[in-house]
Amino acid sequence: MEGSFNILRYDHQKSLWDDFIESSKNATFLFERDFIDYHKERFDDFSLLIFDNDELLAVFPANLSNDVVYSHQGLTYGGLIFKDTLNTNQKDEIRTAIISYIKAHKVKSLIIKPLPEFYYSKTEGISNFWESHSNVIKQHLILAIDYNSDFKIHKTKLKRFNKLKSNGFIIKESPEELSVFWNEILVNRLNEKYNAKPVHSLSEIERLKRAFKEEILQYNIYRNGEVLAGITIFKKGDVVKSQYGIASAIGEKLNALDMLFVYLIYLFRDEGFNYFSMGTVNDNSELGYSEGMLKQKQELGCRIFTQDIWKVDIHD
């Protein structure tokens, strides 16, 4: 018992956890247990459930590594997910209880990578709790289109898009497009261009697609029967996010990825979404971000949002 709260480690309370996530205005499907646990063998789970008597007030997706609690190393973002009716003071009391709980478990520090701001309800009270209890150790630049703003796509990209149909390009979306994209483009091109691998293997993303049929979509663009580029989309609430997006060598010469992005930008605008996130542009360069990726995403109509990574030192 931490103050008036009862804090429990997650231990197969899947239905309780998932029901809470689904009822929250500000959670995403990445916080559901089927997503968190698809690679559970890689992480020592330290997820927490916070109760007031029998009432679940908050959940905290997290993992433990070398005396540090992270929220969460296996997810794009983490942080506390609260019951929607809580006010700012109640949320800060829970944050304090979390720190006390992990201190009692001999944890040295807590690192939190919160949801980008556009996932949050506009009416939610803003707390300065982390500003006074932690330090910013990194700042990610997140590029996203705000559909409620007067966003503009660069005229060159629009010109290419306008030739999409007349030049014989075809766009397909189906579960089967995942294996086409992974096997024919994504794995090889990430290795060639960045000496990197996808975060998800093909079997993992297919398993996630089966669990989240409506939230994970794969769009590929073809010409003359050849796949040229693909974009993997994660959808939640009024936000869509491009999780992967890359072209083949031929597709790059034909600007196929630009055409596919512009197609999706208009598609999701017309479907009523508020934001289209294209992810971070941070890298290991001296600047800390890719100038080329920043320019590319800004030309697609994105603006910069920041995501602060917080570190709380736990003192004895």
Which residues make up each language-model segment?
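Short, flexible, mixed-charge acidic loops at enzyme active sites
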Residues: 68-73, 293
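A gly/proline- and charged-residue-enriched helix-loop-helix capping module
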Residues: 73-121
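Short Asp/Glu-rich motifs
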Residues: 121-122, 183, 286-288, 316
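Aromatic (often tryptophan-rich) hydrophobic motifs at membrane interfaces
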Residues: 60, 81-86, 92-99, 214-315
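A conserved beta-strand-loop-helix scaffold within acyl/acetyltransferase catalytic domains
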Residues: 3-53, 60-68, 114-144, 148-251
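Short, solvent-exposed loop/turn segments at the edges of secondary structure
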Residues: 73-77, 138, 305
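Short, high-confidence coil segments that cap the C-terminus of an alpha-helix
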Residues: 43-45, 104-107, 216, 270-273
